[in-house]
Regions:
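Generic detector of well-ordered alpha-helical segments enriched in charged/polar residues
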Residues: 38, 42, 64, 129, ...
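Cysteine protease-like catalytic core of ubiquitin/ubiquitin-like
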Residues: 74-169
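Cysteine protease catalytic domains with a Cys-His-Asp triad
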Residues: 1-96
Length: 208
């Protein structure tokens, strides 16, 4: 269990907030605009998840080809072949959950692209929709969050990867339980995920 999860389990939201603020004092605002790299996402999840770009889904025949240990961090390419919008996919006893920090439905980020841009980035088909429909047809419930955890109005906010990493680190929680945990800290969600990911990455660096 990650250190911050242990703090929350033992002391609740207020204890977690105090611990995170002590560990990450003074640098959160700047880093809310600093996106995580795929290496950061892999490190935060200790390699126990798949990390894919959207074009990787083209070859997938089912969600079994997408998920690793029931999790996948999925990068929609919206800017270049290495940059875009992070989302998460979880398989739990309750079914498959798609997590977008903006609260968008699966494949909504594809609508941000012109047809020409989509083809250039090899995102001309709705492959995730295809795979989720297949899972649903096989009897596996599929859901997605409709709540925006990430600030929508701030164009400088680049916390989607941080949101996805935190949600995937809490794949044992239901989405309402996860939302309740965030709310219990008294922080807005962008501040929370920035402090958590900064603290975890710094802790890993110290141990290296």
């Amino acid at each position: 269990m990650a250190h911050w999860r242990a703090v929350y389990a033992q002391g609740g939201g207020h204890a977690l907030a105090a611990s995170l603020r002590e560990e990450t004092s003074g640098r959160v605002r700047a880093e809310e605009g600093e996106p995580l790299s795929d290496a950061d996402v892999r490190a935060l999840l200790h390699g126990a998840t798949a990390v894919k770009t959207y074009p990787d889904l083209r070859a997938a025949r089912s969600m079994d080809d997408v998920l690793h240990d029931g999790r996948c961090a999925l990068l929609y390419l919206t800017t270049s072949d290495t940059e875009g919008h992070w989302t998460g996919i979880l398989r739990t006893p309750r079914g498959i959950e798609y997590f977008d920090s903006y609260g968008h439905a699966p494949d909504e980020p594809l609508t941000w692209l012109s047809p020409q841009k989509a083809m250039a980035l090899h995102e001309g088909q709705r492959d995730l929709t295809r795979l989720l429909h297949d899972a649903s047809a096989r009897g596996e419930p599929v859901s997605y969050n409709k709540h925006a955890f990430q600030a929508l109005r701030n164009r400088n906010m680049a916390t989607c990867g941080r949101h996805v990493a935190c949600r995937l680190m809490c794949n044992d929680m239901t989405l309402p339980e996860y939302a309740d945990m965030l709310a219990s800290t008294g922080m807005n969600a962008d501040e929370f995920v920035t402090r958590v990911t900064d603290a975890e990455l710094a802790r890993m660096k110290r141990k290296a």
